[in-house]
Structure formats: C-alpha cells, structure tokens
Curated annotation (Swiss-Prot):
NCBIfam families: L6_bact. One of its GO terms (cellular component) is cytosolic large ribosomal subunit. This is Large ribosomal subunit protein uL6. Keywords: Ribonucleoprotein, Ribosomal protein, RNA-binding, rRNA-binding. Pfam families: Ribosomal_L6 (PF00347). It comes from the Bacteria. Belongs to the universal ribosomal protein uL6 family. Transmembrane segments: none annotated. InterPro entries: Ribosomal_uL6-like (IPR000702), Ribosomal_uL6-like_a/b-dom_sf (IPR036789), Ribosomal_uL6_a/b-dom (IPR020040), Ribosomal_uL6_bac-type (IPR019906), Ribosomal_uL6_CS (IPR002358). GO terms for biological process: cytoplasmic translation. Gene3D superfamilies: Ribosomal protein L6, alpha-beta domain (3.90.930.12). GO terms for molecular function: rRNA binding; structural constituent of ribosome. Part of the 50S ribosomal subunit. It comes from Polynucleobacter necessarius subsp. necessarius (strain STIR1).
Length: 177
C-alpha cells in the first residue's frame, strides 16, 4: 500500500459521503461529485474519517490505493472549498470578458474567441487581463484553464500570450548578427 493511500481523509462538516459498492458520491455546499473506484480498492467510513482498503494483495491494488485516496480527497475539498486557477493575459490588446456561461477572449486574432464553459465551472474577470476559473472538480478546472491557455500560449521571445499567474516564462535571446 502506498504512503498516500495509508493516510486517512477527514471529512469536514457540510460534506456528505455515500458509498455504494465501487461508486462514491460526495455532496457539499458547492455541488455533488461522483466517482467509480478501481475494483482492487474500496473505502471504509468511520466517525467522519475515510480510509482506503485493499480488496486484494496484488501490486496493482497497492498502486491504486494512493490514486483512489487522492481522487476522493480532491472530491471532498472540491465540494467544500472548491478549486480555482488564475490566468493572466500579457500582450497589447489582449482582453478577456466573462459573460454568463461563456468567456470572450481577444487574443490578437482577426476574430474574438468565444469559449463555452462546461457545467460546474465558472469564470470571473476582475480586470481585462485576468481570468479566474473556479469549480468543484479539480480535473475540470485544470482542463478549462489549459484549453484557454492553449489558444495563445506564451511565446518564448517577448512572453506574450495567456499564462498561469504562477508560471515562469523563460525568454530566449534574439538572434545576433
């Protein structure tokens, strides 16, 4: 069993967990998330603490225990506090505007990019060059942030483009004669 899989998950107040065989459902103030666990692992719930249990002694079960624990912990954190990813737009004329379920991006193309946000993910634009993507599903929030960044990823000479706030763009030196 992995080190991550051995550590228990404390369930905060406001989160309800229901285990139905390999299917786990987590409900909280920010929504509901479901996940099917791998057949080699299971979950045991006692006094607001979840622990991962191995169903067999195969090496695969040991490897899956850490994965299952991390996924379930992300679900619990997601429905209670949520996840967010911050993006910044660097470049002249680069703008973003959140309009309901869509995100309008002006990234130097001849046309505006309209990105439709999936269910469960919200976008905010505190300024024209900042985007905050929020949601309860960590994977979905990261996927949306990566797709928005992919429209105009930072170029290596001036650093213009869409980047994560904590991202460091290493700039290349221009060609000398």
């Amino acid at each position: 069993m992995s080190r991550v899989g051995k550590s228990p998950i404390t369930v905060p107040k406001g989160a309800e967990i229901s285990i139905n065989g390999a299917n786990i459902t987590v409900k909280g103030p920010l929504g509901t998330l479901t996940h099917n666990l791998h057949p080699s692992v299971g979950l045991k719930q006692e006094d607001g603490v979840l622990t991962v249990v191995l169903n067999n002694d195969s090496p695969e079960a040991g490897a899956q225990s850490g994965t299952a624990r991390a996924l379930v912990n992300n679900m619990v954190v997601g429905v209670t506090t949520g996840f967010e990813r911050k993006l910044s737009l660097v470049g002249v004329g680069y703008r973003a505007a959140a309009q309901g379920e869509t995100l309008k991006l002006q990234l130097g193309f001849s046309h505006d990019i309209i990105y439709n946000l999936p269910k469960g993910v919200k976008a905010e634009t505190p300024s024209q060059t900042e985007i905050i993507i929020k949601g309860s599903n960590k994977q979905q929030v990261g996927q949306v942030a990566a797709e928005v960044r992919a429209y105009r990823s930072p170029e290596p000479y001036k650093g213009k483009g869409v980047r994560y706030v904590d991202e460091v763009v290493h700039l290349k030196e221009t060609k000398k004669k």
